[in-house]
């Protein structure tokens, strides 16, 4: 099957915070050096942020370095953390407040912000496009491309127009090859292509096993008078 191809200097797989920040920083460096650079971000979601479900307590040091003027650029960081209260639930009906002296520094969030990570990604995408990054939402990277020496040379996106029976429909369209001198895999936890790369290049050798957790998101409607009274347990 013949697929159309596009060539870039850097192909970034994943339009989450790490992929978008990578693309932005690369273009910033290129512009500082007056160098030509082509960067593409391919994202499986129908739009940037569509697959970002996380609410987030956001520490800003990375954003401070990437966009020092973010406070004047309408970044979606509007709700600063006012205080921390941590409770330990010892049973279904009992618990107690943990004294501050026993709370590690890393668990204090003064100066951080309560944000929607999806909205932050949308904002980062707008900054990336302003830096001339190409962003392709709605295209899932499904295959890693290798050259004759086994070196990664980009990715291919999924074919479209495949029926439930696996047969091609009239609307069939072959995926695209996005070829890059460098490919950055920023798929997040247990990304399909990332797992292939880990296995192919034996990246787990002499490494501790990874730990994974499942996050559950709840949206509560509360009395506006209580909107600041949030405790982490």
Which stretches of residues belong to each language-model region?
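Active-site catalytic pocket residues across diverse enzymes, especially alpha/beta-hydrolases
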Residues: 26-30, 197, 201
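Beta1/beta-strand and adjacent pyrophosphate-binding region of the FAD-binding site
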Residues: 4-18, 40
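Glycine-rich FAD pyrophosphate-binding loop
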Residues: 27-51
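Conserved Rossmann-like nucleotide-cofactor binding loop
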Residues: 18, 47, 190
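Conserved small/polar residues in nucleotide/adenosyl-binding loops
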Residues: 233
């Amino acid at each position: 099957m013949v697929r159309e191809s596009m060539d870039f200097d850097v192909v970034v797989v994943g339009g989450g915070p790490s992929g978008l920040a990578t693309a932005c920083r690369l273009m910033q460096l290129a512009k500082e050096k007056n160098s030509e650079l082509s960067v593409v971000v391919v994202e499986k979601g129908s739009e940037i942020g569509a697959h970002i479900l996380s609410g987030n307590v956001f520490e800003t040091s990375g954003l401070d370095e990437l966009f020092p003027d973010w406070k004047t650029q309408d970044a979606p960081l509007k709700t600063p953390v006012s205080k921390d209260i941590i409770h330990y639930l010892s049973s279904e009906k009992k618990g107690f407040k943990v004294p501050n002296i026993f709370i590690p520094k890393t668990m204090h969030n003064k100066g951080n912000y309560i944000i929607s990570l999806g909205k932050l990604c949308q904002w980062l995408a707008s900054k990336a496009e302003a830096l001339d990054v190409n962003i392709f939402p709605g295209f899932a990277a499904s295959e890693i491309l290798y050259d004759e020496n086994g070196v990664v040379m980009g990715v291919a996106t999924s074919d479209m127009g495949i029926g439930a029976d696996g047969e091609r429909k009239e609307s069939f369209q072959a995926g695209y090859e996005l070829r890059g001198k460098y490919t950055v895999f920023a798929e997040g936890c247990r990304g399909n292509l990332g797992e292939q790369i880990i296995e192919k290049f034996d990246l787990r050798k002499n490494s501790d096993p990874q730990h994974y957790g499942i996050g559950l998101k709840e949206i509560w409607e509360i009395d506006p008078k209580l909107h600041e009274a949030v405790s982490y347990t």
